[in-house]
Amino acid sequence: MELITELFDEDTTLPITNLYPKKKIPQIFSVHVDDAIEQPGFRLCTYTSGGDTNRDLKMGDKMMHIVPFTLTAKGSIAKLKGLGPSPINYINSVFTVAMQTMRQYKIDACMLRILKSKTAGQARQIQVIADRLIRSRSGGRYVLLKELWDYDKKYAYILIHRKNVSLEDIPGVPEISTELFTKVESKVGDVYINKDTGAQVTKNEAIAASIAQENDKRSDQAVIVKVKISRRAIAQSQSLESSRFETPMFQKFEASAAELNKPADAPLISDSNELTVISTSGFALENALSSVTAGMAFREASIIPEDKESIINAEIKNKALERLRKESITSIKTLETIASIVDDTLEKYKGAWFERNINKHSHLNQDAANELVQNSWNAIKTKIIRRELRGYALTAGWSLHPIVENKDSSKYTPAQKRGIREYVGSGYVDINNALLGLYNPDERTSILTASDIEKAIDNLDSAFKNGERLPKGITLYRSQRMLPSIYEAMVKNRVFYFRNFVSTSLYPNIFGTWMTDSSIGVLPDEKRLSVSIDKTDEGLVNSSDNLVGIGWVITGADKVNVVLPGGSLAPSNEMEVILPRGLMVKVNKITDASYNDGTVKTNNKLIQAEVMTTEELTESVIYDGDHLMETGELVTMTGDIEDRVDFASFVSSNVKQKVESSLGIIASCIDIANMPYKFVQG
């Protein structure tokens, strides 16, 4: 035990998220432990009687209870399942918050009760560590009631109290039980006799036994029932990296993020009409389709003879023109249609190609030869579809370039322009790292100083408030690499929270032009599944990359104020649209985009998501904890009416989008390999 105590670093606290920030006294938290999908948390509360009746902390309360719980991947609160791989760091983090709360709100006593079975055999070490923390951090003002440590075999108790206040005088601390002890006056003061054993005990021992007697009867379930939590805060807690630096700057901007995601009140961008017209222009579509030279790719792969190259090109172009009139040239539907047409055309020539190639393997048995040739065909098809979508996406996106290049930025103030330039230049890494909690002020490896970063974020926030609005129907694209644990939480929760400013592009930059190649993800399902790796769409793929590559397709950006730099403020070739920090998106569709083209095995996903404003989020909900623990189903408490909450619609949206079954092809063409970092960071 001494060894563990000495090795313990009392400065090692884990990231903590306030799950109900509207409360004047913060009192419900999640603790981010490594990269687990389910995270431990805790609630601060007080009891109004000797039973299970509990309530939120209020000003003037003198006794506080800490009740541990588990925050599930779906965003619900359940009984504690465990403290993660490092129970000691959890306790350190919990008591850091507890001590701050006690000092700030003048609370005299605080108690944690935890099942010993959930401490990974470290119950005593946890008590010792708590004692050390209190002694080192309270300056001698608080002490532990050590007489409570060994009272109970089931629970580990830790009770802290103000040193100069008698425990029996603190409201909320039970009186010494007359069932357990007899009080006897003596020359040295009051002494207590244990009624069962007849032994004399100290006053602290009698108080400890009385506290344990009262609290042993209480259930954590009673505390979990009717707990209020913020949906935004849940998404925040589940988008955390495994470590972060909660500097005052991080806390400042975390608290104000929701303000930037109110419904858009800015005017439409100055070239709104031109953007809409070009996006749906037949001429722009025809020009972009001219870049689809699948005939050449077919010929180079020995699928067709040279004299059929121009015929194939014309066939694909005509079919696409017929099916895509009036459709936005950069929409996911357009890319999906093109990928599907290329794939259908490939299938027409598969039989002859297959026969020619299988004859080359006459030395193999039939099954082995078929498998070998089929794998070769899948690799060829994957490369061709990726190539054609890459060419189309680049040409279609470039049609919008004049709008960005000639963008008028006169509406922004000099300070706002400076903030935008710093972000779109080399400062975006430092700015977003500070917002993500990855900026370490003690390690100067950045370009900007802490004060420069804070000023830049303030200027950018101001630019968003003075920003502009996109017309409806514009699709934005972005790539991202994500920890598997965060990805899995997003899959279950169906929402994702961006702490940082979100760099997106007007053109489909995720299809081979930069980073995560998602092309296979837009194939029709029955065809995509023959070449993609994960057949369940939302699972994880074993690849050389331990991160999940995400190709974001984001709609609904017209709902919030945005910044479209362009002109003199940003490189126009990126066609960047910056979305506000603190953005939440609802995940409408996840399509597997993994592929194996013979040289690379990827772990990519194509995700269609929709921007949600603060008004589309119900920030706090009261959940029926009894029903949750009995059935696993989340039910909200609204007086006498119970509303069932479907986690697939965890955030409410009035927009119902039809999900096309043929989306699969395009997902596999996501390409993350060479994209600028700001389109990936987050």
Curated annotation (Swiss-Prot):
Optimum temperature is 20 degrees Celsius. GO terms for molecular function: NAD+-protein-arginine ADP-ribosyltransferase activity; nucleotidyltransferase activity. It is an enzyme of class 2 (transferase). Keywords: Glycosyltransferase, NAD, Nucleotidyltransferase, Transferase, Virion. It is found in: Virion. It catalyses: L-arginyl-[protein] + NAD(+) = N(omega)-(ADP-D-ribosyl)-L-arginyl-[protein] + nicotinamide + H(+). InterPro entries: ADP-ribosyltransferase, Phage_T4_Alt-like. Proteolytic cleavages at the N- and C-termini by the prohead core protein protease give rise to the mature enzyme. Its EC number is 2.4.2.31. Optimum pH is 7.5. Pfam families: ADPrib_exo_Tox (PF03496). Gene3D superfamilies: Toxin ADP-ribosyltransferase, Chain A, domain 1. One of its GO terms (biological process) is regulation of viral transcription. Residues 383-614 form the TR mART core domain. The record marks E6, L7, E619, S620 as: Cleavage. Its main location: virion. GO terms for cellular component: extracellular region; virion component. The active site is at R478, S503, E576. Belongs to the Tevenvirinae NAD(+)--arginine ADP-ribosyltransferase family. ADP-ribosyltransferase that efficiently ADP-ribosylates one of the two alpha subunits of host RNA polymerase RPOA on an arginine located in the C-terminal region. ADP-ribosylation of RPOA alpha subunit enhances the transcription of viral early genes. Also ribosylates RPOA subunits beta, beta' and sigma 70 and performs an autoribosylation reaction. Additional in-vitro identified targets include proteins involved in either translation or cellular metabolism such as elongation factor-Tu or GroeL. Mono-ADP-ribosylates host MAZF which may inactivate the latter. This is NAD(+)--arginine ADP-ribosyltransferase. It comes from Enterobacteria phage T4.
